[in-house]
Amino acid sequence: MKALLDLFKQVQQEEVFDAIKIGLASPDKIRSWSFGEVKKPETINYRTFKPERDGLFCAKIFGPIKDYECLCGKYKRLKHRGVICEKCGVEVTLAKVRRERMGHIELASPVAHIWFLKSLPSRLGMVLDMTLRDIERVLYFEAYVVIDPGMTPLKARQIMTEEDYYNKVEEYGDEFRAEMGAEGVRELLRAINIDEQVEQLRTELKNTGSEAKIKKYAKRLKVLEAFQRSGIKPEWMILEVLPVLPPELRPLVPLDGGRFATSDLNDLYRRVINRNNRLKRLLELKAPEIIVRNEKRMLQEAVDSLLDNGRRGKAMTGANKRPLKSLADMIKGKGGRFRQNLLGKRVDYSGRSVIVVGPTLKLHQCGLPKLMALELFKPFIFNKLEVMGVATTIKAAKKEVENQTPVVWDILEEVIREHPVMLNRAPTLHRLGIQAFEPVLIEGKAIQLHPLVCAAFNADFDGDQMAVHVPLSLEAQMEARTLMLASNNVLFPANGDPSIVPSQDIVLGLYYATREAINGKGEGLTFTGVSEVIRAYENKEVELASRVNVRITEMVRNEDKSEGAPEFVPKISLYATTVGRAILSEILPPGLPFSVLNKPLKKKEISRLINTAFRKCGLRATVVFADQLMQSGFRLATRAGISICVDDMLVPPQKETIVGDAAKKVKEYDRQYMSGLVTAQERYNNVVDIWSATSEAVGKAMMEQLSTEPVIDRDGNETRQESFNSIYMMADSGARGSAVQIRQLAGMRGLMAKPDGSIIETPITANFREGLNVLQYFISTHGARKGLADTALKTANSGYLTRRLVDVTQDLVVVEDDCGTSNGVAMKALVEGGEVVEALRDRILGRVAVADVVNPETQETLYEAGTLLDETAVEEIERLGIDEVRVRTPLTCETRYGLCASCYGRDLGRGTLVNVGEAVGVIAAQSIGEPGTQLTMRTFHIGGAASRAAVASSVEAKSNGTVRFSPSMRYVTNAKGEQIVISRSGEALITDDIGRERERHKIPYGATLLQLDGAAIKAGTQLATWDPMTRPIITEYGGTVKFENVEEGVTVAKQIDDVTGLSTLVVIDAKRRGSQASKSVRPQVKLLDANGDEVKIPGTEHSVQIGFQVGALITVKDGQQVQVGEVLARIPTESQKTRDITGGLPRVAELFEARSPKDAGILAEVTGTVSFGKDTKGKQRLVITDLEGNQHEFLIAKEKQVLVHDGQVVNKGEMIVDGPADPHDILRLQGIEALSRYIVDEVQDVYRLQGVKINDKHIEVIVRQMLRRVQITDNGDSRFIPGEQVERSDMLDENDRMIAEGKRPASYENVLLGITKASLSTDSFISAASFQETTRVLTEAAIMGKRDDLRGLKENVIVGRLIPAGTGLAFHKARKAKEMSDRERFDQIAAEEAFDFGTPSTPAEEPQHPAAE
């Protein structure tokens, strides 16, 4: 049997392997791969089109052109297989060996591999400890390098010019050896004793103290140790033999007209061979040194450009002046091997067409055009035709199908029954972008799509196209049906909301049907059942919106759980409702009460309704319900016949007066500006403010008029009811349009923005109903075009962010049920400015509790640790008012190389605990990247109009309770008896009667407190007030003011107020001061006591110093007596520079890339007491003395705002200088939990602003990946180097091993890497190479002899295995288990088998042996 199979050379079962190893090939290895040396640059004979012998396409080396036929035609047919023809030397075998047989070129002079020379940091440079510049000069024959100094005073590796060399030769004769070119470098590499060097470096590392040296040594040590560990010899970085790619991989294709198209590689190889042959000839002829040298340099350059064209010097160009595509270009970049052919392949059995709406389909169906189906399912039809005996051969079957005989259509129906197909709409931004459907054959050429899945695909029917793919194997069909069928994917994986929500006309229909009208036809009637209502409606006795009373039968869950008892029992009750709602009650699934329908159904309500159905009635009932909702919606919208016309856009009559008043106010400001009372900036801000307020007012008047209408009720009185205006209904229901759009139609368009985001102060007072004049139209085109340009940029940027996110998380898969960790994070409701932005229930829903949840009133355990908190649980927790729950989080999961299900919690797309094998990393990346296109690109200029709205001047309680101050709150009582806040980060909390936090408010510096700690207050009570326009500088001590460095014209300037004539002193910017000396001084105040001594800070020797910052208006006079809490100076808020707040997509990218902000705030490194040291030029010195008495200094620029004061005690990680937080500092000083809270909250802020919901755990998953490397601080007895960054899991594994062996484990600190960095520093070199910087990644991996264990998804896709996620994870687990048991069973046999089979001799397979050694 085996012989028979061999005869036809069946596709062999590919090698099973668990890892891939990469390394440098030794010259002998390259020769062993080769099937012969390529000696001539010729390719094919242009007359006979046969390959030239010994040329680049030689049949003798690479194999026959035609299957089983030698070149001269002496041997043809299978029977001669394996014969080598004596005439032409060609082996008789398959032609496809030309894809795998390699050749080689023996180089006449060695050549350095450009990747190891020029890819930074230069590996050759590191091994030789020489600079790149020097090595290059040697390699390209510009200088000599000393190889063996002998007895001379020269040093090894010394560089000398030609002149030097000749002088030294005259001086020392042949006492020493110096060489040029790659030979010299090879000699140096051979001379290196790696073990010795490593020992030496390790001792030097221990003994040195300088940072720079440590860094340098560690780098070099890493490279040398890599060589040592991998057993690769450094001299292999210099090539003596050049391998030649198999000819089929660099084809030469005849075009019509006798021309040839060829791969660039052939050109590059040809140059190498030409130069190599010329060099050989020159060496034989003993040509002069200078000619040989030139030839050697040209050979080096030819090999360089073959390997990586354009890396050094100018790129080699072909006939048409474009750079040739070298081997490196073949693998890197978007069009390279990795991204083009391995990660994204075109697949067979697929087609695409335009989509149209299919309202008659069920949720799990799609309409497939007959012709498409016929083409896609061809093989199945052929098979069926043969089985049925209609056709005897495939050829006959083909004919039948082509003629489209009736029997073929019958068979097609049969074939596609229960055979799901996958539909995909590009761009596939999340996993719902591909779903499976059962095909329904339709006439026409467009694919029909169910309306409810449009939201998931983000599809509309304005010409969108979709692709169809057919899963072929039974396993694929099974997976498509169970995992991907549209009716099994009804929730968004990003947030757990339903994805099958109706939109547009469906919503409009349902909304119209569930509205109620006063005094509709038939109001007040009572009906015995829904069928009676329907009959009355059909006979036009009642209107849809009339209020009626109806007896409605609901199916409720049966309390009786005994055997045979029905699950649902009917319950009849009388409801006051409307006709439309009663009719809709027909489609309610059992288990839902009628009350969910008994209200106007807007889009949000419908979404909530479907969600409730899913939680209460399960998946099947929900899908059926959604389908019926859709059908009813369409039907009712048609019956309603809603249309819009110009008269529906009601312009409010008050508009004229409102706009007129505003114009008057603007005129008044212009007048003030002309008389110099206000600055240009203030005028602009005020004008913009006026117009935005006006726009609001007009909009409000318009909405009031539009949203209600007068109506006569049954008793004949006039009253107002919600309007049935078509435009209003569309916006109110959420079907189409929004209040803002209606305002533009019927109110006023308002202010427009310039492309740079600044606001044009002339508003557009017209609306679209009145029409715009030319100027107004021109102004509005400005912003509109910017919008379009933005969208294009946004899409690209968003796509790139998604790609980076996917890359960093692609190997994160749930691999076990529970890691057993007792760590977690404490979740609280998210409160901002006293508002609850996100309730606790939303934050803990679907998480696993890590500690018991206790009822605060009775102290009994509600939910044990390890419980998955579902809807009922979080509702109960909310009802009891528990304000903090400790839950598990992906960040603290202790699973290595993956995550555990308990730390992840609920799979949001399914609503149950996540399954083992779920690729949660990719899902997280998609959930964050998918809404990326909805985020804005723009950065917000805070200044002018925008900040005006944000200025608050007081804070008031929103609920009843008790005031509590945070520990950081400090205040003093001034002479008037007012409490003035002197802490920068004080907060006031409002707690309820059990002591649970209800609100939290920040109280700024200088605020006056109106309520003290422990005061009981009612909602609406003011807690504190402050002046929003200025920020005071307040003294905490009393005394007499003594100015220091306050010199008029030097550090301060006198300003006289135009209106009041009072003068104040203003501190001027150090940069604008005259002399050098005055730049470093800082105006400040000291206080003197009654005896004229300086007031000291209690308990210290320091005098009280209060510094004034730039722009401060000093309000006290020298020698003035001041009391505690008095204001010394004010800083106008206006003069604070308008700072740009990065918003939208760039902000998200900034957070995930972990970039340090420009003027980052400074955090205290230690816990201790603050004091100010001696100021240096332009900087002030802040000293923190820790509890042991050590001093830690910080230099702070003068213009920065210091948040602490002399003598204040600060905690480690507390902010001491104002500014945006630096995530690296947060991690270092406050730990992982604080960092995660920071990143999660910041990212969520951006998305929340756009109204996008994303679950926190997705962001946490990404933060986990950003923290996956650790830096070794002390290597203990491990194999790591101090300062090295390693994978956390590796480190833990190694430490476990050390502890098991009783050695000293390594200690480490956490490192935060940006997502790009993290993707590139992964342990898998295949994944990193396919992401970015392919050359660098591969160079590094080759030297280290890296081994890729194929843990992630990407690596496995690239090598073509099943991915280790989902069903693939189970497959690999089973395979490994089987291998383990087999290995034990067959240990004996294995030894003999290995002897039989040996290793496969196909050179292409060579690097792919199981690297399990």
Curated annotation (Swiss-Prot):
Q: What InterPro entries does UniProt report for this protein, alphabetically?
A: DNA-dir_RpoC_beta_prime, DNA-dir_RpoC_beta_prime_bact, RNA_pol_asu, RNA_pol_N, RNA_pol_Rpb1_1, RNA_pol_Rpb1_3, RNA_pol_Rpb1_3_sf, RNA_pol_Rpb1_4
Give binding positions for Mg(2+). Answer: D460, D462, D464
In the record, biological process GO terms are:
DNA-templated transcription
Obligatory cofactor(s): Mg(2+); Zn(2+)
Q: Which residues bind Zn(2+) 2?
A: C819, C893, C900, C903
Q: How is the cofactor bound?
A: Binds 1 Mg(2+) ion per subunit.
Which species is listed as the source?
A: Burkholderia multivorans (strain ATCC 17616 / 249)
- Gene Ontology molecular function terms on file: DNA binding; DNA-directed RNA polymerase activity; magnesium ion binding; zinc ion binding
Name of the protein: DNA-directed RNA polymerase subunit beta'
Entries under HAMAP family matching the protein: RNApol_bact_RpoC
For this chain, the family text in UniProt reads: Belongs to the RNA polymerase beta' chain family.
Assembly and binders: The RNAP catalytic core consists of 2 alpha, 1 beta, 1 beta' and 1 omega subunit. When a sigma factor is associated with the core the holoenzyme is formed, which can initiate transcription.
Q: What does this protein do?
A: DNA-dependent RNA polymerase catalyzes the transcription of DNA into RNA using the four ribonucleoside triphosphates as substrates.
Cellular component GO terms, alphabetical: DNA-directed RNA polymerase complex
Q: Which UniProt keywords apply?
A: DNA-directed RNA polymerase, Magnesium, Metal-binding, Nucleotidyltransferase, Transcription, Transferase, Zinc
Reaction(s) the record says it catalyses? RNA(n) + a ribonucleoside 5'-triphosphate = RNA(n+1) + diphosphate
> At which positions is Zn(2+) 1 bound?
C70, C72, C85, C88
Superkingdom of the organism of origin? Bacteria
Q: What is its EC number?
A: 2.7.7.6
